[in-house]
Swiss-Prot record:
Reaction(s) catalysed (UniProt annotation): UDP-N-acetyl-alpha-D-muramate + L-alanine + ATP = UDP-N-acetyl-alpha-D-muramoyl-L-alanine + ADP + phosphate + H(+)
Enzyme class at the top of the EC tree: ligase
Species assigned in the record: Caulobacter vibrioides (strain NA1000 / CB15N)
Source organism, top-level taxon: Bacteria
Protein name: UDP-N-acetylmuramate--L-alanine ligase
Signal peptide: none
A Pfam family it matches: Mur_ligase_C
GO molecular function annotations of the record: ATP binding; UDP-N-acetylmuramate-L-alanine ligase activity
Keywords: ATP-binding, Cell cycle, Cell division, Cell shape, Cell wall biogenesis/degradation, Cytoplasm, Ligase, Nucleotide-binding, Peptidoglycan synthesis
Gene this protein is translated from: murC
Enzyme Commission number(s) from the entry: 6.3.2.8
Cited NCBIfam families: murC
Record function comment: Cell wall formation.
Length: 473
């Protein structure tokens, strides 16, 4: 039985989550269970997330049926849930409150001071890093993340402190419902245009995200990114803390070195008023220039919240990472296999740069499962030119994510695009069962294989080391 940790304003019946196993939904559901709500929910299939919630006391339904919402007091849903879902239809018929995921997250944020982490890329890792530094500083935050934090074994936790750290999802514009005390913007790229319509609308969304903070709060923004730097000129009456590698950044990272064990770097803080503060010789067991920038954002926020230099260094050195962010799934015959969620060209390029940095004497072999036909169509040029740090690129079929195929936008089109843009070795993957033998033919001891995508390619990455071992027996 879970102890009720905070009072709720009314006695409510069960709160029903449609798609409760989703990474964003499951985190909110877990927090609500832990603060005293009765939670139930449905999903198309059982998963590690639904099993974890069931152990915490949630009632879980597999499949969707109108009968599941009997007795519910409210329904929480995400934009992935269609209007004709039988549970949505039943909820409307019963005149139950239908609450968007972000709206429920905003309700949880009202209970504490909050840090909301936004940006096209890097949100999940940066959220985890902020949480790690606040934990190291004794602030014991509540956390709602978009990925499994290895240190917690879950994507959410209830802390005893005054702060909540959340990942702010811009994909459907719902992050504008989050009224945070502190905001972070890591970068801004042309993504999720199916919702926003055009890039100007995306940029305006991030401007509003920052303007939503109160006068006593602040936003940490990465001015290494040109669109974020441009954004700073449009923000009025809100405090900004800039960070990056450039000399104009208030929180500047320098002397970055990559090695097999991760990154080392220095940070110097040069506030507009007051003396400069140095953090020299910081170590982080995570590769990639992009992750150093994510860590710099976390340092910028942590020091503003009162975390001292010793705790910051300890928190970074002990950072356990996030599942599906450059996660090593095994080593077979000297070949390292890595799983990564990267599915946008900017993310893929950053991951491959990190892979190259930690594999100085071996080959980098990328296996990519494009995610959504519309994304591949809209960014075909970018996808065709973002794999330069991979010696070999193996392209799988597109993961549909519920979309219908688009003529001329498929695996073979991307292979052709890679070759057109000058890649020397781009290969199609006929089916997942062919992957082990293809990797065995391409890779030797000392090489790194990274599997990229937001679909079910993650299951291939965990199976691959054992499959490679079996081929040599």
């Amino acid at each position: 039985m879970i102890q009720r940790r905070r009072p709720v304003p009314f006695e409510l019946g069960p709160v029903h989550f449609i798609g409760i196993g989703g990474i964003g939904m499951s985190g909110i559901a877990e927090i609500m269970i832990r603060i005293g709500y009765t939670v139930q929910g449905s999903d198309a299939k059982a998963s590690a997330n639904t099993e974890r919630l069931e152990k915490l006391g949630a009632r879980i339904f597999i499949g969707h049926d109108a009968a599941h919402v009997e007795g519910a007091s409210a329904i929480v849903y995400s934009t992935a849930v269609k209007a004709d879902n039988p549970e949505m239809v039943a909820g409307r018929d019963k005149r139950l409150p239908l609450v968007r995921r972000a709206e429920m997250l905003a309700e949880l944020m009202r209970l504490q001071f909050s840090v909301a982490v936004g940006g096209t890329h890097g949100k999940t890792t940066t959220t985890s890093m902020v949480a790690a530094l606040l934990d190291a500083g004794g602030l014991d935050p509540t956390v709602v993340n978009g990925g499994i934090i290895n240190a917690y074994g879950t994507n959410a936790k209830v802390g005893e402190g005054d702060w909540i750290v959340v990942e702010a999802d811009e994909s459907d514009g719902s992050f504008l419902k989050l009224k945070s005390t502190v905001a972070i913007v890591t970068n801004i790229d042309a993504e999720h245009l199916d919702h926003w319509g055009d890039f100007d609308a995306v940029k305006k969304g991030f401007q509003d995200f920052i303007q939503n903070i109160p006068f006593y709060g602040f936003a940490a923004v990465c001015t290494d990114h040109p669109e974020v730097q441009a954004l700073t000129s449009r923000i009025e009456n809100r405090r900004l803390v800039t960070y990056g590698t450039n000399p104009q950044a208030e929180v500047r990272v320098s002397n970055i070195e990559m090695g097999p064990e991760g990154a080392t770097f220095d940070i110097i803080v040069s506030p507009r008023a007051g003396e400069a503060v140095r953090y020299d010789g910081l170590k982080m067991p995570m590769a990639g220039h992009h992750n150093v920038l994510n860590a710099t954002a976390a340092v910028a926020v942590a020091r503003e919240l009162g975390v001292d230099a010793e705790a910051i260094a300890k928190g970074l050195a002990g950072f356990g990472g996030v599942k599906r962010r450059f996660t090593t799934t095994g080593v077979a015959n000297g070949i390292r296999v890595v799983d990564d969620y990267g599915h946008h060209p900017v993310e893929i390029a950053a991951v491959l740069k990190a892979a190259r940095a930690v594999t100085p004497n071996g080959k980098v072999i990328a296996v990519v499962q494009p995610h959504r036909f519309t994304r591949l169509r809209d960014l075909m040029t970018e996808f065709s030119s973002c794999f330069n740090d991979a010696d070999t690129v193996i392209v799988a079929d597109v993961y549909t994510a519920g979309e219908q195929p688009i003529p001329g936008v498929d695996r073979d089109a991307l292979v052709a695009g890679l070759k057109k843009f000058g890649h020397r070795r781009a290969l199609p993957l006929e089916n997942p069962t062919a992957l082990p033998r293809l990797i065995a033919a391409e890779a030797t001891s000392g090489d790194l294989v990274v599997l990229l995508g937001a679909g079910d390619i993650t299951t291939w990455s965990y199976a691959l080391p054992g499959q490679l071992e079996a081929l040599t027996k």
